[in-house]
Amino acid sequence: ADRGLSGSFNANVLKEAQNEIDTFGKENIDLFCIGKKTRDYFTRRDYNIIESHLEFWNDLDFQHAIKIGENIINHFISKNVDEIHVCYNEFVNVATQTIQSERLLPLEYKQDDNPSNADRLYEPSKEKLTKSLIPRHLNVQMWKYLLESYASEQAARMVAMENATDNAEDMIKNLTLEFNKARQASITKEMLEIVGGAEALK
C-alpha cells in the first residue's frame, strides 16, 4: 500500500514476505516492490530492489498488471533468478484478509493435471501455445494479485476507521461522564459552602 490508516495491513504482508525471504537468504533475493511501504521497508534494510511500482492505485487497471508481469517474466527468462514468489493480501470478506505466498514461476503442475498418457494434437504447436498462453496467464495472475490487495487494503482501512470511530465514541462517553461527575462535585461543594456560610451568620 502507499498509504497508512489501514491497521496491520502493511505489517502483516511485510512480515510474511520477510519470513519467505529468510528461508532463501537475503543475498539470494531480488525484489519487485509494489507500494511505498514495501519499498521503504526493504530499502531501509538494504535489499536488492529491481523495481518499485508506486502511486498507481487510484488509476489501477490491467495495463499496470501487464507492465509488472512482463518485467518479472523477463527477469525470470534472463535466468537472473530460479523462482518467482508473490506475497499478497487475499480478500476473503470485509472483516477478513489472509496473507498468501505463492510461487508464480516456474509453473507448478499437479499430478492429476495429466490424467492419461493419450496423444494430443495441438493447433498451433504446443510451443506456440505455450509462448502465447503463459504470458497471458501470468498477466492475469498479476492482475488478480493487484485486485485482491486493493480490495483487502480498502476493507482493512474501513475496519480500522470503524474501530477508530467506535473508540472515539467510547472516549467521548467516558470524558462526558467524568465531566458531569466533576461538575456535580463542584456544584455540591459550592452548595455546601453557601450553606456553611449561612449557618455561620446565624
What do the PLM-derived regions correspond to, one by one?
Residues 1-202:
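C-terminal beta-strand-loop-alpha-helix "lid" module of Rossmann-like NAD(P)-dependent dehydrogenases
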